[in-house]
Amino acid sequence: MVRVFGHITRPEFYEEADRTGMLLWQDLPLVGGYSSKVRRAVKTTMREAVDVVGHHPSIVIWGGHLSPNGELFGLPDPDRSGLPSERNRTVRRMARHVLPNWNRSILDSIIGRELGKMDPARPVVARSGVLPSVGGPHRSDSHLWLGWRTGTARDVSRVFARWPRLASFPGGIGTQTAATGSWPLTAPEWSTAERASFERYVPRRAYGDGESWAAATETYQCEVLRSHIETIRALRYRPSGGFCITALVDPEPAGGFGLLDARRRAKPAYHTVTDACRPVVVLAQRLPLTVVPGQVLSLDIHVDSDLRRSLDDAVVSAVVSGPDWPPELIQRRGFRGTIPGDETTMVGTVTITVPDLTGPLELDLELESHVADGGLGADDLHRVVATNRYRTVVIPAAESLTELTGQARRRGRS
């Protein structure tokens, strides 16, 4: 499904979507907050939108009011980070998203009701880009921007565990990248670049040349998207029903949020998303960024299947290794059983004891099974293989973040 985000686009797009069978989530051109004087104008906008594109069979859902209370998180401000004024600003933004107000409580109810009357054949999402209602039944595609405007991509599972309804259908997933080139130290400077986010997560000054920085922005985009998608897939139907990536194509040659650049060439993130969205994936909890010798990790292993038939006699293998590990240190674990269709299944837990070595540590997962005709194609039996790899780095215990933090605190007290 492709979402036409906050606007109505050219007729050729809808004609091509009809021809190819592409499904569309069509937003109304209603973005941001409005005063109480616009009720009649909003109804006119809805009526015209239905008249102009409502006859296209590719449109399967209407989106009503986009970000009625503004973005929950603005661009990071390193000069204000952690200050009481910045925390107060975040609290005020959250209050606008969850407490009753004109846009949320009245205008959006009108949009949902009237749009449903104008086009009763399609479902309507009255508002999007807001937090779920406190204690209410409404869900939303909350735009959290983890790993780009706040927090990190590793916060995704923790945030969803604390407020599960945020995982219902999250949006605001992604990061900007810079096109390959000899970028100066002042980059990024193109018109739509979110410079503050680059400075926080992938600063140009941290790289010796522009080409390395541009490649790092693409690697970071892959990491953020993969972390979100894998976490969401592990929560299938409990409560997640899907997700929406920020953009498919960059709006300008210099860069953007897209999985494709402005010339429609695939970025590395395009392949990352393709792999993360395959019909069957094998998943593990994220490894820490660094580990130390002797540390023990327990990681749950899940298999998420989009197939409509079960995978019988499935075998999941887990191998923990490093580039220079002797054979006796390589750790292996296996699981066997049936993987139900259209479900996420926890197959077991892998316990890793970090050996007394330093350097890369990798967890390789592989699932192998067969599915009868009807699952993937027209043959009688199909082999299903899913693989995944997670990486961390083993560092000496004295260099662990906890130890370094403790040293800094002790120096501060002395």
Residue spans for each PLM region:
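Short beta-strand elements
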Residues: G375-A408
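Short, aromatic- and glycine-rich surface loops/edge beta-strands on solvent-exposed regions
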Residues: G359-D380
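Active-site mouth of glycoside hydrolases
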Residues: M1-H138, F243
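Extracellular and select intracellular beta-sandwich modules with Ser/Thr-enriched
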Residues: A314, L329-Q331, M346, V384-R389
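Extracellular Ig-like/FN3 beta-sandwich strand-entry sites
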Residues: V296, D313, T345, T358-E362
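Substrate-binding clefts and catalytic carboxylate motifs of secreted carbohydrate-active enzymes
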Residues: W62, R92-R96, I106-L107, R113-G116, ...
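Aromatic sugar-binding surface patches on proteins
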Residues: P340-V350
